[in-house]
Amino acid sequence: MLAVRNMKFGIFLLWWGWVLAAESTVHWPGREVHEPSKKGSRPQRQRRGAHDDAHKQGSPILKRSSDITKSPLTKSEQLLRIDDHDFSMRPGFGGPAIPVGVDVQVESLDSISEVDMDFTMTLYLRHYWKDERLSFPSTNNLSMTFDGRLVKKIWVPDMFFVHSKRSFIHDTTTDNVMLRVQPDGKVLYSLRVTVTAMCNMDFSRFPLDTQTCSLEIESYAYTEDDLMLYWKKGNDSLKTDERISLSQFLIQEFHTTTKLAFYSSTGWYNRLYINFTLRRHIFFFLLQTYFPATLMVMLSWVSFWIDRRAVPARVPLGITTVLTMSTIITGVNASMPRVSYIKAVDIYLWVSFVFVFLSVLEYAAVNYLTTVQERKERKLREKISCTCGLPQPRGVMLDSSYSDGEVNDLGGYMPENGEKPDRMMVQLTLASERGSPQRKSQRGSYVSMRINTHAIDKYSRIIFPAAYILFNLIYWSIFS
């Protein structure tokens, strides 16, 4: 029994000695031993520093793992063998032209500017082609979709918009670019673009005009020998949003065409056209231009019903209508380009201006003839000597252009109601008629002299409206 106990105690001492020996040779992570009284403390620190240096020099325990966000792109590039090919050359270089199909979905037609002669359109532009260099093995025949980062590493068609003034690819929240690759190498390249392009407009029938604009797509570097550009599904390649509308235009039609463009320095290129026809809404211009002009012409006719002696009433009315017509013409031309030909709206406005101006000239003629009439009447009164009691009277008929003073001079006749009559008969007897046999043979006869300049206003009340109505019938039958 005692021997067994001694053996157990010996085993325990051996185990304890082995533990102490292990603690003196093994460094425990995160544990620091401070024994300044011992001489072996400095070598221990040196060994610890050497141990840390070993970790700093590339110990696999502290090696940082690669960025997992970049690993799918790297695997995709390896799967597509991006580094094994030269993508600066087009697919099938040296062979026939590579066919590139295009389809477009118009998202919005933002604005049409007559002054700048351009339009702004936002669209989805999609390209279709086959590049066998991008083919990859796939058991489920699924395509791979990428963003714009891969576009910079492979070959894509170098399309541009002919006659464009400004264009950009949308980048909210990221670049609106998508690349989809099929296992057999077929590629779909789609991007969202806003472009402002030129549109040659003809304003000879403005605002009753119809405009046709085109957005032209073409390869910048590759001629028809290298790249064959075509609409993938014909007219069905162009899709539009049904909600597209413009404030001043009605979109009548969208259609596609394909033509060849020739450049003397480089050759022939395939060019795709997106054509759309716009018809202008006339109601806005009826309210803003035609109706005010017609109203001013009709207002100028009011002067024909005003007494020709009322100069303060007729003159300001004529001047006001002329100035208003000038303002309307100036306002219309300010919103239009300075073209060298006459527009339909110019014809209407200038003819209306002529009618207004003629109404002013009409009153000038009436006023002048009235003044001449008064001068003749004054001379006539001076030649006639008024002698009471002469048996043979001669009648002089005057119209309403006489004044109150003239009535007193001609005998003091005035109706009971106090109003001036349109005509009055003044009985005058010449002294030389009493003893003349020739005058006696003419007793009882009267000579009437009628001077009536008011007839010009009466004729103008009919001629001016009739002529303006005839002009409107001809104008709207031609331009509508």
UniProtKB/Swiss-Prot annotation:
Recall the taxonomic lineage recorded for the source organism. Eukaryota, Metazoa, Chordata, Craniata, Vertebrata
Recorded GO cellular component terms are: chloride channel complex; GABA-A receptor complex; GABA-ergic synapse; glutamatergic synapse; intracellular vesicle; plasma membrane; postsynaptic membrane; presynaptic membrane
Membrane-crossing residue ranges in chain numbering: 282-302, 315-335, 347-367, 459-479
Membrane topology according to the record: Multi-pass membrane protein
**SUPFAM superfamilies, sorted:** Neurotransmitter-gated ion-channel transmembrane pore, Nicotinic receptor ligand binding domain-like
The gene name on file is Gabrr1
Name this protein carries in UniProt: Gamma-aminobutyric acid receptor subunit rho-1
Mind listing the GO biological process terms from this record?
Answer: chloride transmembrane transport; modulation of chemical synaptic transmission
Q: What does this protein do?
A: Rho subunit of the pentameric ligand-gated chloride channels responsible for mediating the effects of gamma-aminobutyric acid (GABA), the major inhibitory neurotransmitter in the brain. Rho-containing GABA-gated chloride channels are a subclass of GABA(A) receptors (GABAARs) entirely composed of rho subunits, where GABA molecules bind at the rho intersubunit interfaces. When activated by GABA, rho-GABAARs selectively allow the flow of chloride anions across the cell membrane down their electrochemical gradient.
Write down the species. Rattus norvegicus
